[in-house]
């Protein structure tokens, strides 16, 4: 298994953030990814509007999963309407 950082940006609305972050955690666990750490970075103004939102809540996950699962997770995360954007980055050991 490799280690990855997943930066996820959710809507600034509290209820949408809680719903979305719970769904992302569940999605990671369903796909055999182990969440090593989770950091709530906070709410920030976006550099440019995403899905008509000017502010977003950032959540950083450090996950361990098989390399083949990242593409599948990326595709499933793109389909989530409550997630403004996300980025997977492989962490070098």
From Swiss-Prot:
UniProt cross-references to Gene3D superfamilies, sorted A to Z: 3.30.70.60
InterPro entries associated with the record: Ribosomal_bS6 (IPR000529), Ribosomal_bS6_sf (IPR035980), Ribosomal_S6_plastid/chlpt (IPR020814), Transl_elong_EF1B/ribsomal_bS6 (IPR014717)
Keywords of this entry: Ribonucleoprotein, Ribosomal protein, RNA-binding, rRNA-binding
Role this protein plays: Binds together with bS18 to 16S ribosomal RNA.
Family designation: Belongs to the bacterial ribosomal protein bS6 family.
PANTHER family, alphabetized: MITOCHONDRIAL 28S RIBOSOMAL PROTEIN S6, SMALL RIBOSOMAL SUBUNIT PROTEIN BS6M
Protein name: Small ribosomal subunit protein bS6
Gene encoding the protein: rpsF
């Amino acid at each position: 298994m490799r280690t990855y950082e997943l930066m996820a940006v959710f809507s600034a609305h509290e209820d949408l953030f809680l719903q979305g972050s719970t769904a992302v955690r569940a999605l990671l666990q369903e796909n055999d990814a182990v969440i090593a750490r989770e950091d709530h970075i906070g709410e920030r103004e976006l550099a440019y509007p995403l899905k008509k939102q000017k502010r977003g809540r950032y959540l950083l996950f450090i996950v361990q999963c098989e390399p083949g699962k990242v593409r599948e997770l990326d595709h499933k995360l793109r389909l989530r309407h409550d997630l403004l954007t996300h980025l997977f980055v492989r962490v070098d050991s």
